[in-house]
């Protein structure tokens, strides 16, 4: 394969036409890029209603009409000139830009690869004026009278007609239309105060009337999202975060329902996406993606939007503080799902006669001291005590097989109001798997293993975060056969194991002895726990397992210890589990994002039995 050689040429300036076409390679990547640039111009012009008409996926025609301020006839030629704009006039304005567009190259770039006609009318003009984008050094753009309502229409036809090589890289009509429609949806989500209409090949595809973000997001993301979303509203100094995040149960197999905006601009920023993903990390499977519509507003001087040709990436002046703010805001919203559904979390109340005591301890911890000092905000999280005992240990549960339906009549529900306890009071245990409880809304079904697993997981996290992992020494050490790798891991990672609450000693080249386990896990299979911990520490390294794999490891430990199916619980034990669920953050989902309980309201039960028909 031989390299091609170019004839020797002297250095010379490029023509305006070629310069614009080179710029178009970055700005006009595909039809959807044209739609994006024109929609942003319409919004910058103050439009409150925008119509988008497409033909053949936008390749044959893209026509966007708005009711914005319009352009005077004297300014129309400048609108098609390269690097001409009304949005900035100095470096200071560029660094504080508040508009979506600012480079002044979009229309010129589009006109260099398509037939473009710009029609505009200001509110005080008697009629509209139009100009056609004519490329070529010997031709001038002429302004002519036209008809039209106040506002602007940009009509782009025959995209890439003069650059056939670019057309070859386009996909099918439906694919290109899909990209265009997604751009319209993104921008429509950012501006619910603006009406949008989208048509393709003469048929109306969608219309979004002026509305609030709740209804606009429900329209675009669908009923699945609107029925499983949490409101998000946080402010810290110059940072304001608002929008909606989906519950883990509304996660998707693809990340196509993730919309993040910075000062009204849709972005795909790695820092922000990582912050949101980290907040979901212990309530969502690794192969699932959360759904959300989040907007971050801040001083334009604190963010640089001029770092990517399509302005889809941004750079923050204090990226660490922004990351921490977004992460903790989303984490708190997810942690308050119970409170969102049922109201305030109940305060500690003495257990009724015959029931086991339960404990709720709240410790205040402040995150990111440097962030607090800079923005004057202190954020707190709640840490809770043990599930059944005040000493932090898990109460042993019955080991005998449970009957298919175990019920009890001496229920505290007879003497206490459901209003104080969102999850109500236990009625029965079903097949040794589910707890049936009654609250003021109707029937509550609890997956007892998933719920208990979540409670233990949160307790283990809190203990590890506070360096307060309580250890239960074993009266008689448990010895087991170990291979060379396990023995080596126990020797090399003793400090890591101790920090996790495990004291594992090497007795011989083939024998390990478990001398202590975490108090929270004292009723689990110690040998199985030890092998799992040794495997993870060996695979990821002692230091990494406590940072990168901490949540996965603690989730495994919690799963081993949580109450299993066919374990019969007494009435007080079931109620104690319900009370601790109410006092535990993120208790609505297990560690894998599945629901731990569901509510069947009285109306739902009426429908099942066709009552009232």
UniProtKB/Swiss-Prot annotation:
Q: Which InterPro entries match?
A: DNA_mismatch_repair_CS, DNA_mismatch_repair_MutL, DNA_mismatch_S5_2-like, HATPase_C_sf, MutL/Mlh/PMS, MutL/Mlh/Pms-like, MutL_C, MutL_C_dimsub
A Pfam family found in this protein is HATPase_c_3
Checking PROSITE patterns in the record gives: DNA_MISMATCH_REPAIR_1
Kindly give the SUPFAM superfamilies that the UniProt entry links to this protein.
ATPase domain of HSP90 chaperone/DNA topoisomerase II/histidine kinase (SSF55874), DNA mismatch repair protein MutL (SSF118116), Ribosomal protein S5 domain 2-like (SSF54211)
Instruction: Tell me which domain of life the UniProt entry assigns to the organism this sequence originates from.
Output: Bacteria
* Keywords of this entry: DNA damage, DNA repair
Known function: This protein is involved in the repair of mismatches in DNA. It is required for dam-dependent methyl-directed DNA mismatch repair. May act as a 'molecular matchmaker', a protein that promotes the formation of a stable complex between two or more DNA-binding proteins in an ATP-dependent manner without itself being part of a final effector complex.
Give the matching NCBIfam families: mutl
Which protein family is it in? Answer: Belongs to the DNA mismatch repair MutL/HexB family.
Identification of the protein by name: DNA mismatch repair protein MutL
Source organism = Janthinobacterium sp. (strain Marseille)
Gene name, please?
Answer: mutL
């Amino acid at each position: 394969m031989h390299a091609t050689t170019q004839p020797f040429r002297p250095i010379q300036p490029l023509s305006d036409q070629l310069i614009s076409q080179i710029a178009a390679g970055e700005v006009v990547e595909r039809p959807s890029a044209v739609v994006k640039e024109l929609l942003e111009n319409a919004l910058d012009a103050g439009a409150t209603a925008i119509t988008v008409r497409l033909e053949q996926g936008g390749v044959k025609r893209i026509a966007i009409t708005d009711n914005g301020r319009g352009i005077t006839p004297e300014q129309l030629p400048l609108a098609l000139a390269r690097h001409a704009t009304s949005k900035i006039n100095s470096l200071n304005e560029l660094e504080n830009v508040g508009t979506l567009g600012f480079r002044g190259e979009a229309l010129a770039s589009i006109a260099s690869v398509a037939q473009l006609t710009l029609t505009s009318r200001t509110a005080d003009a008697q009629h509209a004026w139009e100009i056609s984008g004519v490329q070529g050094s010997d031709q001038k753009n002429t302004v002519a009278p036209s008809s039209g309502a106040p506002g602007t229409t940009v009509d782009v036809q025959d995209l890439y007609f003069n650059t056939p090589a670019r057309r070859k890289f386009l996909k099918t009509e439906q694919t290109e239309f899909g990209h265009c429609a997604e751009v319209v949806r993104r921008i429509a989500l950012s501006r619910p105060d603006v009406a949008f209409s989208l048509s393709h090949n003469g048929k109306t595809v969608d219309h979004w009337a002026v509305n609030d973000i709740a209804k606009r997001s429900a329209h675009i993301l669908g009923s699945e999202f609107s029925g499983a979303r949490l409101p998000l509203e946080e402010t810290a100094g110059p940072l304001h975060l608002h929008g909606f995040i989906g519950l883990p149960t509304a996660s998707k197999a693809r990340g196509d329902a993730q919309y993040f905006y910075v000062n009204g601009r849709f972005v795909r920023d790695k820092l922000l996406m990582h912050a949101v993903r980290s907040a979901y990390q212990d309530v969502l499977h690794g192969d699932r993606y959360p759904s959300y519509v989040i907007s971050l507003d801040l001083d334009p001087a604190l963010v640089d939007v001029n770092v990517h040709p399509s302005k889809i990436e941004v750079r923050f002046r204090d990226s660490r503080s922004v990351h921490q703010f977004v992460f903790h805001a989303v984490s708190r919203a997810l942690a308050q799902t119970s409170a969102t559904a049922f109201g305030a979390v109940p305060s500690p109340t003495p257990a009724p006669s015959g029931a086991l005591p339960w404990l709720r301890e709240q410790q205040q911890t402040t995150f990111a001291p440097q962030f607090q000092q800079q923005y004057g905000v202190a954020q707190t999280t709640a840490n809770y005590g043990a599930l059944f005992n005040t000493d932090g240990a898990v109460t042993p549960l019955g080991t005998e097989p449970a009957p298919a339906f175990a019920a009890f009549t001496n229920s505290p529900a007879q003497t206490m109001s459901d209003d104080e306890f969102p999850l109500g009071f236990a009625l029965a245990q079903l097949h040794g798997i589910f707890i049936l409880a009654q609250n003021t809304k109707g029937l509550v079904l609890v997956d007892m293993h998933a719920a208990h697993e979540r409670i233990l997981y949160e307790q283990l996290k809190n203990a590890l975060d506070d360096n307060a992992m309580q250890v239960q020494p074993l009266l008689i050490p448990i010895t087991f056969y170990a291979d060379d790798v396990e023995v080596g891991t126990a020797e090399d990672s003793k400090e890591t194991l101790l920090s996790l609450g495990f004291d594992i000693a090497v007795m011989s080249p083939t024998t390990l002895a478990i001398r202590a386990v975490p108090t929270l896990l004292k009723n689990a299979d110690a040998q199985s726990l030890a092998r799992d911990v040794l495997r993870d520490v060996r695979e990821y390294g002692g230091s990494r397992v406590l940072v990168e794999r901490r949540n996965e490891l603690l989730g495994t430990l919690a799963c081993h210890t949580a109450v299993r199916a066919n374990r019969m619980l007494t009435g007080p034990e079931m109620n104690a589990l319900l009370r601790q669920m109410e006092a535990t953050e993120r208790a609505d989902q297990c560690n894998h994002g599945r629901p731990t309980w569901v509510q069947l309201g009285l109306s739902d039960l009426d429908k099942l039995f066709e009552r009232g028909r």
